[in-house]
Amino acid sequence: MSGFKSDFLRTLSERGFIHQISDESGLDELLAKETVTAYIGFDPTAPSLHAGGLIQIMMLYWLQQTGHKPVALMGGGTGMVGDPSFKDEARKLMTEDTIAENMASIKRVFANYLTFGDGANDALMVNNGEWLRNINYLEFLRDVGRHFSVNRMLSFDSVKLRLDREQSLSFLEFNYMILQAYDFVELNKRYGLRLQMGGSDQWGNIVNGIDLGHRMGTPQLYALTSPLLTTASGQKMGKSLGGAIWLNADMLSAYDFWQYWRNTEDADVERFLKLYTTLPLDEIARLAELGGAEINEAKKILATEVTAMLHGRDAAEEAAETARKTFEDGELSENLPTVGVHKATLNDGIGVLALMVLAELCTTNGEARRHVEGGAVRINDEPVSDPRMVVNAAALNDQGLIKLSLGKKRHVLIRPA
């Protein structure tokens, strides 16, 4: 369907967010005539979301910007079960304490994108543990479980993937689909919520909730999914050679976050500007026309705009300036990520492989060795060819720092502590 009446669907369509909608005309009509409450679920499986989940946060952002009410549902209850959708194996179960700690950490990110409060379209953050932990199992089976067909649940692609590979799917995980469907109904009852959004891998789970709502007498519920994004080269969003691109500042610096977006492939620039920034579409179209070396200016704008939304404009501009000094002027900027190494350790000397791991440029000595042997590692801009090299205080420059580099884009300053 094209020519949406509602600002929300029109915005999402123009920017490339929409993969599938359960009832386009019905949802469009509803959004055009009243304030709609909608939610997306987030699993607290780590202390931070990563950039792969940013598209979902942006959907909630545009929902609020077009006059509707966003709800971020934290899976404090379902997080203890684990979503089996398109996973190759069962996920490690998490304790209540770990989930609570992760939720508290994740909450900080949402305040950068959404306005929370008591207004008509102010955002809410809700924990499904509030109702799931108090369920009476026998009553739940009688009132909710009877509405689910096991035959139909087995037909979902997310389940078939595991079964076709002859991999175990526990009863615990199988129940996740029922619990997520129940969330939709419970949120409708508590907050009048009518729309659930998510990635395209969640389609089956969301439709389950719509069907359950129909059987339990809720008003018409709706589903909207976004595409599962990969880069032009097929890499998953939110991952890099150095690991996950975390959204929390205490897990990834604003500079490293900026660099991730600066390194966007040429073919992805226009798409990412539409999805991850709030720049006007005509400005994005202008930037998309840039070619050759000029495309790098569009990448810098992308990096700065995405970083500004998450970390603030000052941090984004500082990251951009640090990159300019480092890569264009050849200066050693003190705004680069810094790692302290005990003076005694530097005096005695530390192996370059261990230093790479300590600086979080690599996760293992083996990975660091491969980078050294591949010629990707430099100390103070001098190539390192021997993985047995020992780095000591003699490498400190006039500023009392050691510049450790992996490739052309990743740099860390080593400072005696």
Swiss-Prot record:
Keyword Ribonucleoprotein attributed: no
Domain S4 RNA-binding: 350-417
GO (cellular component) term, any one: cytosol
Source organism superkingdom: Bacteria
Primary location class: cytoplasm
Location(s) in or outside the cell: Cytoplasm
GO molecular function: ATP binding; RNA binding; tyrosine-tRNA ligase activity
CDD domains the record matches: S4, TyrRS_core
EC number: 6.1.1.1
GO biological process entries: tyrosyl-tRNA aminoacylation
Broad enzyme group: ligase
Binding annotation for ATP: 239
Gene3D superfamilies recorded: HUPs, RNA-binding S4 domain, Tyrosyl-Transfer RNA Synthetase
Intervals of motif 'KMSKS' region: 236-240
Quaternary organization: Homodimer.
Similarity section: Belongs to the class-I aminoacyl-tRNA synthetase family. TyrS type 1 subfamily.
NCBIfam families named among the record's database cross-references: tyrS
Biological role: Catalyzes the attachment of tyrosine to tRNA(Tyr) in a two-step reaction: tyrosine is first activated by ATP to form Tyr-AMP and then transferred to the acceptor end of tRNA(Tyr).
The protein's name in its UniProt record: Tyrosine--tRNA ligase
Lineage: Bacteria, Pseudomonadati, Pseudomonadota, Alphaproteobacteria, Hyphomicrobiales
